[in-house]
């Protein structure tokens, strides 16, 4: 399986090269030349497998340079005892037609673990397959969860360093503490004055600086990404859509072959894009419902075909979705229109004007699979309260956004098909909002809120989140976007 850039289909690379580079030299994103088909017989076979085995089966055709032995080792190591549920990504039924896919049982209590626990194995193996002699520095811009998951995955991995940038005042206190207390001799963390888009733009500019790349190469370094712009991040996410479907069949929620809707809280469009790839591979997915918070640029795009980032930026109760530039949308546009020239034009308009409008034909294709909705913080807390009162089920703010959007989608469309809400984070990562949602008092700070939520609900907090206030803070720096390149340069000296 080869890959090429969304902005130049003549730039062809292997899977190992795509994972090692992260971002194409022209600024585009790598996409597979074809999508393998999963037959009904293969899907039935997946139902009898463990999560680790399902991961090997789904990823194998995308990684033709990797042996089954390698993939089996990678998945066993990535999805092992560091997950506190043997199912890895368990499906929890709420009622006859609604289930929650819990993707937060890993070491950082967020769905990013599903990809970032295996990415270090894929990346280090890819570097060897490419004959790369230089060391790699992983650059990450995070809206909260990716940063900690990437730090945890790459901490003390030989031949690597990792530097994470997060928006100052743009993550929860628990997310911040998780990052700034990270252990490891090869890690660093810095806040950026601004929002996530400022941090992400800064990282992209560093990747696009050829003179800086040449200077680093002279010193034996090159840069790569652990954000979902890297295909090695996105590929493992396809797996859990297949796994959720199999678990829905095994649990009697649906029959084999029935369509299943998925509702996905997303900001950068990577999580829901993985679901779209799964559908294209043959998974019986009905609608993919994109759930946004007040930064509803994706909802507007799905409804109108116009992507316009020229709007106020809102800091919300679901900070991991506080994003106005959704990088992975570029992959969907390429896959649907098939023209690198057209996609490059859209991306140029976005850079220069902050907006673009797709053709009516392209919007019609998008609307065949995607629906969209959004909710505000008050509605988010109301949904947290409803899930707790009616079902004694505790959900975080991002999951609550998706739960609200599902109810609105069903009410507006009459589509009562079984649906899975993708639950992306432990409720204990956003204790203040969760406490307010269930009627508790949130007049405390950070780890004290974890203890208070445990007391209020009689649910134990995940082990990785306990004792954060007792860990030494290692990283306290804050820089402007213009200083990010200098920060990377100093880190690699």
Feature-to-residue mapping (PLM):
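PLP-dependent amino-acid enzyme catalytic core
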Residues: 1-493
């Amino acid at each position: 399986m080869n890959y090429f850039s969304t902005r130049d289909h003549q730039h062809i690379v292997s899977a190992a090269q795509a994972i090692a580079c992260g971002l194409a030299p022209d600024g585009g994103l790598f996409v597979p030349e074809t999508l393998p088909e999963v037959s009904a017989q293969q899907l039935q076979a997946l139902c009898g497998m463990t999560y680790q085995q399902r991961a090997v089966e789904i990823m194998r055709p995308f990684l033709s340079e990797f042996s089954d032995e390698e993939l089996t080792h990678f998945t066993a190591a990535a999805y092992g005892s560091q997950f506190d549920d043997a199912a890895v990504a368990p499906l929890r039924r709420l009622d006859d037609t609604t289930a929650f896919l819990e993707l937060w049982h890993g070491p950082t209590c967020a769905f990013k673990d599903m990809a970032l626990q295996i990415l270090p194995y894929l990346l280090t193996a890819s570097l060897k397959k490419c004959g790369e002699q230089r060391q790699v520095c992983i650059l990450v811009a995070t809206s909260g969860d990716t940063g900690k998951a990437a730090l945890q995955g790459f901490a003390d991995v030989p031949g690597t360093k990792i530097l994470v940038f997060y928006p100052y005042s743009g993550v929860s206190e628990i997310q911040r503490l998780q990052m700034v207390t990270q252990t490891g001799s090869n890690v660093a963390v810095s806040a950026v004055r601004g929002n996530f888009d400022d941090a992400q733009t800064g990282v992209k500019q560093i990747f696009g600086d050829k003179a800086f790349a040449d200077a680093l190469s002279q010193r034996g370094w090159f840069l790569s990404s652990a954000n979902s712009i890297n295909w090695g991040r996105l590929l493992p996410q396809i797996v859990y859509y297949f796994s959720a479907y199999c678990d829905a069949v095994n649990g009697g929620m649906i029959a084999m072959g029935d369509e299943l809707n998925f509702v996905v809280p997303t900001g950068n469009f990577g999580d829901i894009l993985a679901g779209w790839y799964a559908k294209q591979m043959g998974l019986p997915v009905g609608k993919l419902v994109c759930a946004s918070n007040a930064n509803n640029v994706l909802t507007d795009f799905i409804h109108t075909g116009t992507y316009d980032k020229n709007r106020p930026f809102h800091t919300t109760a679901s900070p991991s979705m506080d994003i106005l530039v959704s990088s992975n949308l570029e992959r969907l546009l390429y896959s649907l229109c098939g023209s690198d020239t057209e996609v490059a034009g859209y991306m140029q308009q976005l850079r220069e004007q902050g907006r673009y409008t797709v053709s009516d034909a392209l919007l019609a294709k998008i609307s065949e699979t995607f629906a969209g909705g959004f909710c505000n913080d008050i509605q988010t807390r109301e949904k947290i309260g409803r899930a707790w009162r009616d079902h004694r089920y505790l959900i975080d703010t991002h999951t609550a956004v998706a739960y609200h959007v599902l109810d609105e989608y069903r009410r507006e469309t009459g589509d009562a098909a079984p649906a899975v809400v993708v639950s992306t984070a432990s409720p204990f990562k956003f204790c203040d909002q969760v406490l307010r949602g269930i009627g508790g008092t949130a007049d405390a700070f950070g780890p004290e809120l974890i203890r208070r939520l445990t007391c209020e609900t009689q649910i134990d907090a995940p082990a990785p989140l306990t004792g954060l206030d007792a860990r030494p803070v290692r990283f306290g720096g804050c820089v402007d976007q213009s200083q990010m390149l200098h920060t990377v340069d100093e880190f690699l000296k």
